[in-house]
Amino acid sequence: MNLLSLRPFGARLLGTVIAVIALAGAVTVAASAHGGGGDKEAVAIDGGATLLTVDAGTLEALSGAGFAVEPIEPAQVSQAASGEVTFAFPIAWGSLAASDLSGKIKHRGGLNLSMDGTTVGVKNFVIDTSAGVLTAKVVGSRDRIPLLNLDLTNLQAFVFDDSAVLRGVGATLTAEAATALNAAFETDLFTEGLTVGTADVFATLAD
């Protein structure tokens, strides 16, 4: 079973990300996660994407156990020549405090994790930078669970007039998610603190 169902990022989504990355690259000073920010109390987000680059070791472990990972549209996935796999989740909307970047960012799309006829889907991710967690809606239920713990220790943040960039967000599996996945797939592969990867947020700001 193939681990990933790969498809290139769509042109519109890729164009948005490239534009925001280019703007971030032109800036030489980054605000830390808990400092600097700007002269606005809050910034409203109305688009962009969050990219999740998956840890290579975790991918290998999942592949060896027979798992398949597929994006739920409009999320997309791409693989670099190096083998690095990145999922892109479009941003629906959100808001961040300019002073410390606390707030929430809501996304569209999600992920399906499958093995031996069993599929668990999670979608509509919400990043809560204040709580340091990413929550997800479980497909087929009304439940929303804490899916990933977010480590902002190495965060680099940039806020501009029309965009915001949060780079280097570490993502690990929560205890609740690990328990649910182990129960669904009758395995002990998933553990609290399992390294999932690194997230980079490229957000466009509302006018």
Predicted regions mapped to residue ranges:
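Acidic, glycine-rich flexible loop segments
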Residues: 124, 130-175
